[in-house]
Design a protein with these regions (language model features):
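Membrane-proximal basic amphipathic "stem/tether" segments
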Residues: 133-193
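A structural motif corresponding to the C-terminal lobe/cap of the Radical SAM core domain
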Residues: 1-153
Length: 193
């Protein structure tokens, strides 16, 4: 059967969903996720895109906080990028924000070239903080442990990823050791980079 569902929720703000031409509402996304959970979906990932050209800080925060209100197992927060062949690429070329083939091989975040966008570094910090808050909620942790114990798929996946998890934790501990020595602050969390 189906083990993982990946929902392209994108935003909790109708104005931004309209900009993306999504033809959905935040409430429809909420209903879809709840329905999938009730139907027995084992792992549900919610994908969100922040950093649209005129998206406000409050709208970005609203989207990040929306993830906490729906029964997903993991949020994937993406910062909107501009890539060749997309409508936004054409829009930005027409506005003169892209010149002579710049970024055609790699693309670029909207927030790095659009003067009306929230700055990239600020969005990145908001996303980082939002993911941290999402995964540190006591209700989230307890539900994930309970789901792990009930799901052979999750147990198998966790066991298969133990070496990877060890590498992530080790990398984090090595990076944080210098920080603790410089600041004298207590260790705050294992998976925050």
């Amino acid at each position: 059967g189906c083990k993982i569902l990946y929902f392209g929720i994108e935003s909790a703000n109708q104005r931004i969903l309209n900009y993306y031409n999504k033809r959905i509402t935040p409430e429809e996304s909420r209903t879809a996720v709840r329905t999938a959970r009730k139907a027995g979906a084992d792992v549900i990932v919610g994908s969100f895109i922040v950093g649209a050209p005129d998206e406000t800080r409050e709208e970005i925060r609203n989207t990040i906080e929306f993830a906490n209100t729906i029964p997903i197992d993991a949020p994937q927060f993406n910062i909107l990028g501009v890539y060749p062949g997309t409508e936004i690429w054409d829009e930005f070329e027409a506005k003169g924000l892209l010149k002579g083939g710049e970024y055609w091989e790699t693309g670029i975040a909207v927030s790095e070239i659009c003067p009306t966008a929230v700055p990239y570094k600020e969005i990145r910090q908001m996303v980082h903080d939002g993911f941290y808050r999402f995964t540190r909620r006591p209700s989230y942790v307890s539900k994930q442990v309970a789901r792990l114990m009930k799901s052979p798929y999750r147990i198998r996946t966790a066991l298969n990823n133990l070496p990877r998890l060890g590498g992530i934790v080790g990398h984090h501990l090595r990076g944080r050791a210098g920080h603790r020595q410089r600041t004298g602050r207590a260790f705050r969390g294992l998976l925050v980079s």
